[in-house]
Amino acid sequence: MNWQQRSLAAIIGVVVAIGSLAAQSTGTVSGTVTLTSASREPVGTAAYGRRGVAPKPAAVGPETRKVVVFLEGVKPSAPPAPMRAKITQRGEQFLPAVTAVTVGSIVDFPNEDPFFHNVFSLSRVRTFDLGRYPSGESRERSFPRAGIVKVYCDIHSQMSALIMVLEHPWFTIPAESGTFTLPPAPPGEYTLVAWHERIGEQRQRIRVTAGGTTRAAFTLPVLESQP
């Protein structure tokens, strides 16, 4: 082994050691989000008539992709790295409907429909108007402040999307199955939040331990029960 090979091996060893140390000094937060809807079958026997509805898992598919799971009130020691996200205009919809990014991130808005769109927001966190632009064109905006930004199309009133801008990187959007895992978090006690624009939010107190895994489960009612 020559000196170059030895130097490369030493560098790889340092990188592996740093990665191992980082993993040992942070913890994993993972879990599930379950959305429930109202069953139309009555609860109880026929002798007492209909007394309400029983919640059951909702086959809502992508609705879980409209949930944001995050640690609440966390102040990182350094500003989080900005991200690059994309919200596509396709089929007269914004895809995805919900996006979460860190402060300072840039979001691209490509138009994949064969007609014009005009993306805008009147949210105080970030007000903008991208103007009308045709198919195949993309425009972007940065998001320097934390908060919730609601996005619309000035041409197609049914189109809407939501961007949650956070001051730290410890957040995620669950998979369609409802499973989620946050980026590795420093040890400590936190409030974990599962948020949905229409449903509201649920909170859980959790403890993150170095090198450990903290699990949480949320159940959110996606539909109101019908009398």
Predicted features and spans:
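Bacterial N-terminal signal peptides that target proteins for export
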Residues: M1-I11
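Bacterial N-terminal signal peptides
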Residues: A9-S20
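Extracytoplasmic copper-binding redox domains, predominantly the cupredoxin/blue-copper superfamily
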Residues: Q24-P227
